[in-house]
Amino acid sequence: KKMVGIVIASHGQFAEGILQSGNMIFGEQEDVKAVTLMPSEGPDDFKAKAEAAIKSFSDQDQVLFLVDLWGGTPFNQTNNLFEEHKDKWAIVAGLNLPMLIEAYASRLSMNSAHEIAAHIIETAKDGVKVKPEELAPKEAPKAAAKSGASAGAVSYTHLTLPTICSV
């Protein structure tokens, strides 16, 4: 049975570390590769490594990219590769361990990168929890659709991110 190939992409060795963690929990996986952007490397180095990872998959028709950070170099370079395969490939940013494990489990029954990508987002979000529970954000009412906001739109107005020039 053909399985969706998974590229885990990150700044630094995060991708290799989370690959190891996922294997400890779920077992060794075929057609999964970690692709890292190291401090001494540039976008072209990363892209070449990503292309080599994809070429190593037994089936390159269906590829899912799990990326650490939306808008960073690993995302931008995987996005460049993705552009020619939008109908089959998918990218999910915000990589965490629940996301990776759910992707592994989903590959057993789901045959498309799009299907897996859509499925793992909720699990990834649910993996972010806090104790004590009262520190958790209050559930916002699901009224975005009525207010005319486009479906699937996400608002980041509540986040204050540091400005990082080198990503």
Regions found by a protein language model. Name each.
Residues P74-E84, A105:
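Short Gly/Thr/Asp-enriched flexible loops that form oxyanion-binding sites at enzyme active sites
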Residues S106-P132:
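Short, glycine-/small-residue-rich phosphate/pyrophosphate-handling segment
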Residues T157-T163:
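Conserved small/polar residues in nucleotide/adenosyl-binding loops
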